[in-house]
């Protein structure tokens, strides 16, 4: 049994690696930091390969696939990604395009390549509760990337189901999680964050049960349910105010 995890050096990805290792899975771990990956390797007893790749460079996505295509990989976890906070005029276009490359294009490349290979049993795409809403002022591009991940995963699930492919497709949509994401996005959440350990275990357990949409935490589930009934303009105003508070509490 073997799993490939991108963005594995910290946060949810790191905890997923540890949890799957405890379940007996050999691992292929990918992240930019070789030091963090090698440190994680020491904490896990199963066989591990590490690849220090910046996957926002899309050539590295293809290179990664070539490196591991002879392995029998059962689980693909597309976890690599990040967010940017700021008014549309403040965030640099190159930074936004880099985020799109990692959050969307990398995920799609790896998903497509491993599906074509025909060995994969589970794909877990890490999105966000942001991906289930109607837009995120002050994090507009990030919200849009996660909406893409959600909708791509939903459509892929149905296509594979109709073809009777025995492949589990799941999309993880957490609310606030206590990870380095907050520092990179330069925000601080007002809501209580879940631990990455809890989110990782919850997500993988639900993935094995072939749950399509995985939302950890009761409060987030309830919130997402009621948001569906709000008019779009009202929801955008509420979201803007919530985002602004993240900036004011840093």
Language-model features: locations:
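Active-site helix of classical SDR
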Residues: 111, 145
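Residue(s) in the substrate-gating loop at a strand-loop-helix junction
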Residues: 128
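Conserved glycine-rich cofactor-binding loop
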Residues: 9-10
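C-terminal helical subdomain
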Residues: 171, 188-224
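Conserved glycine-rich Rossmann-like NAD(P)H-binding loop of the short-chain dehydrogenase/reductase
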Residues: 23-39
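Conserved NAD(P)H cofactor-binding loop of Rossmann-fold oxidoreductase domains
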Residues: 79-84
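Substrate-binding pocket helix/loop in short-chain dehydrogenase/reductase
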Residues: 87-88, 95-100
């Amino acid at each position: 049994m073997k799993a490939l995890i991108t963005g594995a050096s910290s946060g949810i990805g790191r905890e997923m690696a540890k949890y799957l290792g405890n379940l007996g899975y050999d691992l292929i771990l990918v992240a930019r930091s070789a030091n963090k990956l090698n440190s994680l390797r020491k904490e896990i007893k199963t066989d591990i390969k590490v690849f220090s790749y910046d996957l926002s460079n899309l050539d590295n996505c293809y290179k990664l696939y070539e490196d591991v295509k002879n392995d029998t990989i059962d689980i693909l976890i597309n976890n690599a990604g990040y967010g940017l906070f700021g008014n549309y005029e403040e965030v640099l276009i190159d930074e936004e395009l880099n985020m799109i490359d990692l959050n969307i294009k990398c995920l799609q490349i790896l998903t497509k390549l491993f599906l074509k290979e025909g060995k994969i049993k589970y794909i877990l795409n890490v999105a966000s509760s942001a991906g289930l809403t109607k837009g995120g002022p002050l994090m507009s591009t990030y919200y849009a990337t996660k909406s893409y991940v959600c909708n791509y995963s939903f459509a892929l699930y149905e296509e594979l189901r109709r073809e009777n492919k025995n492949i589990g497709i799941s999309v993880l949509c957490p609310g606030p999680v206590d990870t380095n994401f907050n520092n990179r996005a330069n925000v601080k959440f007002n809501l209580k964050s879940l631990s990455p350990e809890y989110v990782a275990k919850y997500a993988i357990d639900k993935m094995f049960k072939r749950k399509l949409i995985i939302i950890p935490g009761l409060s987030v589930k309830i919130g997402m349910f009621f948001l569906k009934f709000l008019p779009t303009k009202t929801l955008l105003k509420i979201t803007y105010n919530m985002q602004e508070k993240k900036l004011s509490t840093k």
